[in-house]
Structure formats: structure tokens, C-alpha cells
Amino acid sequence: MVRELCEVQGLIFKRKKYKEADILTKIMTKDHGIFTIDVRGALRPKSRLGAATLNFSYGKYIVNTNWKGISSLRTFKDVKQLDQLYLDLTKNAYSSYVLDLLDHAFVEYKDIGSFYDLIMKALLKINSGEDVAVITQMVQLKLLNAYGVAPQLDRCLICGKVQGTFDYSLELGGIICSDHFNSVSQRMHLDPKVVALIRTLALIDIDRLGKVKINPQLKKNSGKVIDRMYANYLDLNLKTKKFLDELALF
């Protein structure tokens, strides 16, 4: 396939050294999915390309590509940076994990559809100071759909009930209403408030998530349940998640 110059709208992440003065970095794009670009001379002093491809930079990038393998960056325009994600260790860790989850859900150059807007909005919210844990949990839940293992959270698995008190079953992959608690032995016996929070984060649009204040213990418990979903449904072993868990210990 012939290589061509193409302008893409995207965000930079996963930057690493390549050869003597180059870097390889991932870019999440609006229309062409996630792919790797070679940024030549990025590590040289005063490199304009290097400055425009720091992690969490976003804008328009002109790449030389044949839509497979490694593309190369030629130039850029209108590039900005989500500076708080770059400078703040906690925000950096959560944002890196969110992008890592997205990266593992898709092959390179595959259109990621609405997940581009989801991730960009999540990162913008984190950058502006909104609750990083709540936003990350929302993204985790929504990305289960990208992996093809989304649980049924909108209604009871047994009878289809949409309102009331619910529990969750990892084995069955969805919520169970209180009418069927006695008949489902595989349920997790969760606090109904935890299930309610998980349902809300999974089902509402990220635009509707305001600057909410959630009880820290409730938030911690919902995070543990979501982690169990990932452990049960997916075989992921992400360094970004390990670092995030280690960070939470301090």
C-alpha cells in the first residue's frame, strides 16, 4: 500500500525512546483509531516535534502512513497539552491507565468510534480537577463493552425489572433484583448503594456526570467490584493498573 500524508486529530500517550534521538509514541485519533508514530529527532535539544508529542498533548498531526505498522510524524498544528495530567502524579497515573485500557481493547488503526469522545471528555474532566476515581470507574465500566464483555446493568437478569434493590452476579454477568435474591446463589451480597453507583456510572452519559461528591468508602467499594469484573472477565495484566494500585497505598 502506498504511503500518504494525512492529517489526524488526536492525543499522544505511551511515549518511549527509539533509536538514538527518536521516540515512538501512541496516538489516539478521532477517525483512524490508535496507532504508533515514529517522531524523528524528538530527543534532540529544542526539537519542535518532541515538544509537540509530550504525553497528553493533543491537536492536529500530519503523519506519513500506509495505515499499518509504524507511521511517521511530519509536522503538527494547533497542539495543546492537558498540563495537569502531565504534572500531577495521581492524575497522570489514572489517565495513563484509562488510555492503556482503551489501547488493549482495539487493534491498531481500527476506528474506536464513540470511545474517542468518551476518553477525551474523561481526560478533560480529570485535568479540570473533577473526581479522578469516579471518572475512571465510569470509563472502566463503559470499556467493558469494547472488550465484548459488558454486563447487564440496566435490568434484572431474571425478570427484567429496572427499578428497586439489586445485587450483582459475576458468574451470570449482571444484576439481580431483590425478588430473586433467594433463587440466585451466585450473587455477591453487595451493599445496594454500591450496585446503584455502579449502575449509574455505567448507564449515564459522561456529559451528565457533574462535580459529584461520593462517600469515599462507597467509592472504594465500587472500585473493588469493578476490579473483580475485570479480573473475572478479562485476562489483562497492565503495568499502569499495578502502579495505580501501588499509588493508592500511600
Curated annotation (Swiss-Prot):
One Pfam family this sequence matches: RecO_C
Gene coding for it: recO
Keyword terms, alphabetized: DNA damage, DNA recombination, DNA repair
Annotated protein name in UniProt: DNA repair protein RecO
InterPro entries attached to this UniProt entry: ARFGAP/RecO (IPR037278), DNA_rep/recomb_RecO_N (IPR022572), NA-bd_OB-fold (IPR012340), RecO (IPR003717), RecO_C (IPR042242)
SUPFAM superfamilies registered for this protein in UniProt: ArfGap/RecO-like zinc finger, Nucleic acid-binding proteins
Keyword presence, DNA damage: yes
Any one of the GO BP annotations: double-strand break repair
Top-rank taxon, per record: Bacteria
The organism's taxonomic lineage, starting at the top: Bacteria, Bacillati, Bacillota, Bacilli, Lactobacillales
Similarity comment: Belongs to the RecO family.
Gene Ontology CC terms: bacterial nucleoid
UniProt function note: Involved in DNA repair and RecF pathway recombination.
